[in-house]
């Protein structure tokens, strides 16, 4: 299949590109190579794919990039936490308007298969379980509570501590920052496009992705990259809150495999898929694991916090396994050891 891969010069995009080539697809990459995401010179080659250097908001460039294409994998986006109000226009323009421009161009070109990179952030705090009230949606955490060292979100009914729950794709949207809002908007735009054109959408809600090629020294570096960079400088990783916040860390090669499978196998309707390892870990666990494999200093739990961060978000990825026959291949210990060898 001939496909267009937006954001194909980025961290996840490069791995998706390799997976597409490995499975025999012909790929055209569209990427703006924006300097706040790409290190100098990175992305100037994309492994033999045709590269269109352009912004996804450039309708004429997107029209040209879609010529002869059968499907689109849309990964181009501004990422990060998105808690600075000054960043709101960039998130809305890069992610929301960019997706709208792409979808309009796909409608003009008659391209009806979309694989969309969404994110676990659409769920906000996800779900928690109260001993008395069962599964509930945790409220936003207050600055006052976190400043006092109280990091667990309370039950919105009785105020008791909540146990974290796995979230599946039926969990309601609850975006807590600009990036999350933009990802929800992308999914809604894609759903509307599919209804009007009869196209298909596979929205892949990536959980915490790590692995080779992670951005290390940009504003968008994930926690694994931040910890690794600190350890390579001989510094102790700085762990926010109490280190017990839970995440589903999933290797980028597994994410790439899921993305390409969705492109190949989901051919009708609109469907969301969580992409996670299925094994929740705490942020503190990751920091200690990286410190061990890199023979670095022990992590320091700082108690610092960021408004807009969620406490726990862990995936139920059974739909992806069941419907697309996907299984993660890289376990946590193997992934940590691989990071140490980079």
Model features per residue range: what roles?
Residues 1-203:
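N-terminal Rossmann-like NAD(P)+-binding domain of SDR-like oxidoreductases, especially those catalyzing
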Residues 57, 86, 94-97, 170, ...:
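Residue-level signal for the nucleotide or nucleotide-sugar donor/cofactor binding architecture
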Residues 64-68, 105, 230, 258, ...:
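CheY-like receiver
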Residues 77-83, 119-122, 208-214, 244, ...:
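Active-site proximal helix/loop that lines the substrate pocket
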Residues 84, 207, 272-275:
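Short-chain dehydrogenase/reductase
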Residues 102, 190, 227, 320-321:
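Structural element of the ATP-grasp superfamily
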Residues 127-147, 153-163, 178, 188-247, ...:
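NAD(P)-dependent short-chain dehydrogenase/reductase
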Residues 231-342:
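C-terminal substrate-binding subdomain of Rossmann-fold SDR/epimerase-dehydratase oxidoreductases
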């Amino acid at each position: 299949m001939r496909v267009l891969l937006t954001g194909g010069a980025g961290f996840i995009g490069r791995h998706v590109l390799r997976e597409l080539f490995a499975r025999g697809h012909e790929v055209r990459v569209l990427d703006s190579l924006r300097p706040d995401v790409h290190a100098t010179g990175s992305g100037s080659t994309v492994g033999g794919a045709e590269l269109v250097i352009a912004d996804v908001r450039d309708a004429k460039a997107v029209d040209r990039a879609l010529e002869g294409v059968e499907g689109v994998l849309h990964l181009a986006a501004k990422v990060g936490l998105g808690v600075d109000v000054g960043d709101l226009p960039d998130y809305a323009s890069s992610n929301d308007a960019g997706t709208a421009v792409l979808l309009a161009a796909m409608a003009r070109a008659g391209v009806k298969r979309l694989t969309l990179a969404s994110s676990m952030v659409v769920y906000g705090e996800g779900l928690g379980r109260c001993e008395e009230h069962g599964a509930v949606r945790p409220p936003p955490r207050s600055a006052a509570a976190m400043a006092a060292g109280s990091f667990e979100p309370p039950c919105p009914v009785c105020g008791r501590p909540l146990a974290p729950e796995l979230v599946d794709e039926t969990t309601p949207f609850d975006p807590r920052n600009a990036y999350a809002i933009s990802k929800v908007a992308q999914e809604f735009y894609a759903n509307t496009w599919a209804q009007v054109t009869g196209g298909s959408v596979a929205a892949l809600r990536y959980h915490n992705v790590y692995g080779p090629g992670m951005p290390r020294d940009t504003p968008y570096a994930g926690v694994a990259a931040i910890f690794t960079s600190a350890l390579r400088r001989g510094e102790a990783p700085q762990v926010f809150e109490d280190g017990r916040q839970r995440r589903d860390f999933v290797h980028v090669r597994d994410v790439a495999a899921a993305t390409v499978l969705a492109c190949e196998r989901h051919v009708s309707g609109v469907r969301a898929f969580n992409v996670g390892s299925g094994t929740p870990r705490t942020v503190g666990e990751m920091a200690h694991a990286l410190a061990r494999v890199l023979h670095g200093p022990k992590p320091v739990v700082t108690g610092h916090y960021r408004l807009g961060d969620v406490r726990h978000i862990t995936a139920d990825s059974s739909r992806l396994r069941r419907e697309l026959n996907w299984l993660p291949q890289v376990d946590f210990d193997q992934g940590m050891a691989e990071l140490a060898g980079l």
